[in-house]
Amino acid sequence: MARTVHCIKLGVDAEGLDFPPYPGELGKRIFEGVSKQAWADWLKHQTMLVNENRLNLADARARQYLARQMENHFFGGGADAAAGYVPPTA
């Protein structure tokens, strides 16, 4: 049976994650209060940040930047927008 959480990002009760997606206290907070849909939305945004900012994930500073952005996305004022990203027009 799926876990249900009150998603702090979407503001609704939704299916929770199956396991903490990140190590440490931040991962625990995300596991306890973020839905699968909100996590999927973050992964899309994270991909845009990596691509648009040309981040090298082998660089510890890039990983620290993404961790800060993840925390801001879920628990702060929001993550940075991907610089230079233009959404596709339908």
UniProtKB/Swiss-Prot annotation:
GO biological process, one term: cellular response to oxidative stress
Highest taxon above the source species: Bacteria
Any single Gene Ontology cellular-component annotation: cytosol
Keywords for this protein: Iron
Keyword Iron listed: yes
SUPFAM superfamilies: YggX-like (SSF111148)
Alphabetical list of InterPro entries matching this protein: Fe_traffick_prot_YggX, Fe_traffick_prot_YggX_sf
GO MF terms, alphabetically ordered: iron ion binding
Pfam families per record: Iron_traffic
Biological role stated in the UniProt entry: Could be a mediator in iron transactions between iron acquisition and iron-requiring processes, such as synthesis and/or repair of Fe-S clusters in biosynthetic enzymes.
UniProt similarity note: Belongs to the Fe(2+)-trafficking protein family.
NCBIfam families, alphabetized: PRK05408.1
Protein name: Probable Fe(2+)-trafficking protein
Annotated organism of origin: Delftia acidovorans (strain DSM 14801 / SPH-1)
